[in-house]
């Protein structure tokens, strides 16, 4: 089954989508009421009145403020002690109606933001998507003060003060612990630099017709947010009469005297994918180590340089017989001939770590279709120096790099981005800084390599990224962010998959 992912939109695209719905007959008040109800249901579920009885709602002058006022009203009806702060004289008509009704119900409005200091949770509805001007003066000062308070802050759609396309801070912005994004993901929420203000992103759908989305985005490159649909990308269905040679053959190449553990981590991760045959090519001196830890693999010892890197691949190793080759973990920059040989192989490739650094010196562009590059931003800058600083932000840069190189480019980071050669983009909104340690990328390379040996490149890429991140999140729950070392991460791969599949039944 082909996964379907929620779209990521710009401000102009979201305005076109909402405009089409309104032109089709949906009353604006009806949409505001629906959105407010869904927001209040989320808040009641995650901030119950037993633990968070006192709620502050910051209401702006526009429809984001109207949504906030509906939330305030609904929480008030459900027994929460609500205080409203709306520091604006001029309101949009619909927002003014909701403010008037809130006063009629007796909800208390406070004049000064300091009056909110004793609440248990803060709901930010000052500004939504489309804000362009910088926040200054007393409003900016109030936001800065709110950011110093210890209570959890929940923003409606976009943290107030954050640009919804670029993720830039417009003077100042609410530092949200959670952002409840309405309808479709806004591009700016997924920019890596915006994450300290976005916190945990949660999509709150409000039933946008798929035909409206398709029409509005028909001429634009597609941008998607990964979600649980990624589990459908894994090669879980097998014929009852299959055999190992029909389940993919993966060649892993890497390791050195300096980085002996990297290729071992990749191999341990790769075998979790169920790949039929796993062959690992390492320096001769590492062969016994890898074989002792991965006895089900065929381990090929390679001639070494004096410093313990692979000098060349051995004669008789037929690269064309493999379904996929993953090259790079622990390789070292000495292995130029290895990468040059791999690039001539007529099979699917994953290139990581020093294979990328060597690739930057070889410049064999464009790459064979379906090649997967997995750089972090430092490696990306070495690979594509002409794009850095000239092609917009990182999301624009990764799209430009994929188009130029003819590869799938996976830019690792707090919000890992995947771009295809046709210019489509996928972003993983869920990850953890617990992965910021040596070896995490080696695990990802093994995962993607094992999946690539069994299926097409794009599915292998986003399936591997999602699986890797979800296993890390689960490991973090048990071991804290300090305990998600690579072997712990690998140990959680199959239990995470099993629980995800059980939840789908």
From Swiss-Prot:
Domain of life: Bacteria
Annotated ranges, domain YjeF C-terminal: 226-500
Keyword Ligase: no
Region (NADPHX 1): 63-67, 128-134
Region spans: NADPHX 2: 376-382
Catalyzed reaction equations: (6S)-NADHX + ADP = AMP + phosphate + NADH + H(+); (6S)-NADPHX + ADP = AMP + phosphate + NADPH + H(+); (6R)-NADHX = (6S)-NADHX; (6R)-NADPHX = (6S)-NADPHX
Chain positions recorded as K(+) binding sites: 64, 124, 160
CDD domains the record matches: YXKO-related
Binding site for ADP: 412-416, 432-441
The keyword NAD belongs to this UniProt entry's keyword annotation: yes
Residues that bind (6S)-NADPHX 2: 330, 442
Region ranges (ADP-dependent (S)-NAD(P)H-hydrate dehydratase): 227-505
Known role: Bifunctional enzyme that catalyzes the epimerization of the S- and R-forms of NAD(P)HX and the dehydration of the S-form of NAD(P)HX at the expense of ADP, which is converted to AMP. This allows the repair of both epimers of NAD(P)HX, a damaged form of NAD(P)H that is a result of enzymatic or heat-dependent hydration.
HAMAP family attached to this UniProt entry: NADHX_dehydratase, NADHX_epimerase
Family per similarity comment: In the N-terminal section; belongs to the NnrE/AIBP family.
Name used for this protein in its record: Bifunctional NAD(P)H-hydrate repair enzyme Nnr
Organism: Thermosynechococcus vestitus (strain NIES-2133 / IAM M-273 / BP-1)
UniProt gene name: nnr
């Amino acid at each position: 089954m082909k996964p379907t992912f929620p779209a990521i939109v710009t401000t102009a695209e979201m305005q076109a989508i909402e405009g089409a719905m309104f032109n089709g007959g949906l009353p604006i008040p009806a949409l505001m009421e629906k959105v407010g109800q869904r927001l209040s249901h989320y808040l009641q579920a995650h901030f119950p009145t037993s633990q968070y009885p006192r709620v502050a709602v910051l209401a702006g002058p526009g429809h984001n403020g109207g949504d906030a006022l509906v939330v305030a009203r609904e929480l008030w009806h459900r027994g929460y002690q609500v205080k409203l702060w709306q520091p604006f004289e001029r309101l949009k008509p619909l927002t003014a109606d909701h403010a008037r009704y809130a006063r009629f119900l007796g909800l208390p409005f406070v004049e000064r933001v300091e009056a909110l200091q004793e609440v248990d949770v803060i709901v930010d509805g000052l500004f939504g998507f489309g804000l362009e001007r910088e926040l200054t003066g007393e409003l900016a000062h109030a936001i800065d003060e709110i950011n110093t308070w210890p209570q959890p802050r929940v923003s409606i759609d976009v943290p107030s003060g954050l640009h919804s396309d670029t993720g830039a801070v417009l003077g100042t912005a609410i530092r949200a612990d959670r952002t409840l994004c309405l309808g479709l993901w806004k591009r700016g929420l997924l920019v890596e630099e915006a994450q300290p203000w976005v916190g945990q992103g949660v999509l709150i759908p409000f039933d946008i017709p798929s035909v409206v989305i398709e029409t509005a985005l028909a001429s634009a490159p597609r941008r998607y947010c990964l979600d649980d649909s990624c589990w459908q990308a894994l090669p879980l269905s097998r014929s009852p009469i299959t055999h190992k040679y029909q389940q993919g053959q993966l060649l892993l190449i890497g390791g050195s005297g300096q980085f002996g553990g990297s290729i071992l981590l990749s191999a341990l991760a790769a075998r979790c994918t169920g790949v039929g045959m796993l062959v690992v090519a390492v320096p001769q001196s590492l062969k016994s180590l890898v074989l002792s830890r991965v006895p089900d693999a065929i381990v090929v010892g390679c001639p070494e340089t004096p410093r313990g890197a692979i000098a060349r691949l051995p004669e008789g190793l037929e690269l064309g017989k493999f379904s996929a080759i993953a090259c790079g973990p622990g390789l070292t920059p000495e292995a130029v001939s290895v990468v040059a040989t791999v690039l001539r192989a007529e099979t699917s490739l994953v290139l990581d770590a020093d294979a990328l650094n060597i690739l930057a010196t070889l410049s064999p562009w464009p790459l064979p279709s379906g090649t997967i590059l997995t750089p972090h931003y430092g490696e990306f800058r070495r690979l594509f120096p002409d794009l850095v600083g000239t092609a917009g932000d990182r999301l624009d840069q990764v799209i430009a790099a994929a188009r130029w190189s003819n590869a799938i480019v996976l830019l690792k980071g707090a919000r890992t981005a995947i771009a295809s050669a046709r210019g489509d983009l996928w972003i993983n909104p869920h990850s953890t800084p617990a992965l910021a340690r040596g070896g995490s990328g080696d695990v990802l390379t093994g995962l993607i390599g094992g999946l690539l040996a069994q299926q097409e490149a794009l599915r292998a890429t986003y399936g591997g990224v999602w699986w890797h991140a979800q296993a890390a999140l689960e490991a973090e729950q048990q071991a804290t962010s300090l305990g998600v070392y690579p072997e712990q991460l690998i140990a959680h791969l199959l239990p995470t998959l099993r629980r995800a599949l059980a939840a789908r039944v």
